[in-house]
Amino acid sequence: MTGPITRKDLMIVNMGPQHPSMHGVLRLIVTLDGEDVIDCEPVLGYLHRGMEKIAENRTIIQYLPYVTRWDYLATMFTEAITINAPEQLGNIQVPKRASYIRVIMLELSRIASHLLWLGPFMADIGAQTPFFYIFRERELIYDLFEAATGMRMMHNFFRIGGIAADLPYGWIDKCLDFCEYFLPAIAEYQTLITRNPIFLERVEGVGIIGGEEAINWGLSGPMLRASGIQWDLRKIDHYESYEEFDWEVQWQKEGDSLARYLTRIGEMAESIKIIQQALEGIPGGPYENLEIRRCNKVRDPEWNNFEYRFISKRPSPTFELSQQELYVRVEAPKGELGIFLIGDRSAFPWRWKIRPPGFINLQILPQLVKRMKLADIMTILGSIDIIMGEIDR
């Protein structure tokens, strides 16, 4: 009598695109051997909207409302990179007051983005309580945004040569009060989360990335700094007025999910330091460069023709892009957000290439989850911090 034949079949599981832990419309095709992950294939494109092609058929001013739909949780950074590119292309000077206000808004947006990463990340690994504490602080930041820009999200606040409006009366004091309140809140997170043995069991030693490996994969932001590489564009490129403030680059050397968590927690405290220094030293003066707001190009009489209204011609230009190319980048919450811009002496970019940090960082996911358990996929994916709006564009 022969014994039973044991078969070893692999199981293929689809995670997403409608899965609460995917952080957007991301689909993962996971090959499993029991609970062990054999392979993982990310499927992208569910949120593709042709953002680069739209940019090439719009003036910079017309395109500004679109860019807040890339990373819709850190919209100040997408606005900053959109106006920094033509500013450098046209050698436009930004008033010091506008530069300080930009720094304040960027760092507030960084804190809000990290908070909205931390809450769902904790929920993914089974900790529901910190989620509500974290959203309490995030709501205060959105109140500050609403008072200054009129919008809680999708602010449309940055302009070429400055910002849309000056800070309202009493806003600086309100923001300083928030900074004093938020620093003890970070210590509260440390007590609730960092010293929790169950949390440490889920994240420590999970998804390890070495320093050389992180560089070879093109990682940036907290993903790179958590692997021992002290690389922060705010220190390296000296854009806006970051060189005038005293702060430290946050980094860890372990390269695991815990290191990425600690890096982002430290960045929130450093952002508060930058905001406090900017608020206390904010100069007076104008908040925009009025000269570049004027159109220097002579209007074409053809634009007034009756037939012109019906043939889908482009509107009159607002800012002429010189015939050259450049790459501009900023340190966004998720990593290096860049724009490759080619001008051709018109108001419309000849080429507008977006370098999204989440898209680059997501590439390493299949390698990180191999030979891990199925439950570790949520931990590793959450530690990467992705937003599908900027990944699919």
UniProtKB/Swiss-Prot annotation:
EC number: 7.1.1.-
InterPro entries: NADH_Q_OxRdtase_suD, NADH_UbQ_OxRdtase_49kDa_CS, NDH1_su_D/H, NiFe-Hase_large
One term of GO molecular function: oxidoreductase activity, acting on NAD(P)H, quinone or similar compound as acceptor
Main location, first listed in the record: plastid
Entries under Gene3D superfamilies matching the protein: Cytochrome-c3 Hydrogenase, chain B
Compartmental location: Plastid, Chloroplast thylakoid membrane
Keywords: Chloroplast, Membrane, NAD, NADP, Plastid, Plastoquinone, Quinone, Thylakoid, Translocase, Transport
NCBIfam families, per the entry: PRK06075.1, PRK07415.1
Cited HAMAP family: NDH1_NuoD (MF_01358)
UniProt record similarity statement: Belongs to the complex I 49 kDa subunit family.
Known function: NDH shuttles electrons from NAD(P)H:plastoquinone, via FMN and iron-sulfur (Fe-S) centers, to quinones in the photosynthetic chain and possibly in a chloroplast respiratory chain. The immediate electron acceptor for the enzyme in this species is believed to be plastoquinone. Couples the redox reaction to proton translocation, and thus conserves the redox energy in a proton gradient.
Subunit structure: NDH is composed of at least 16 different subunits, 5 of which are encoded in the nucleus.
Protein name (record): NAD(P)H-quinone oxidoreductase subunit H, chloroplastic
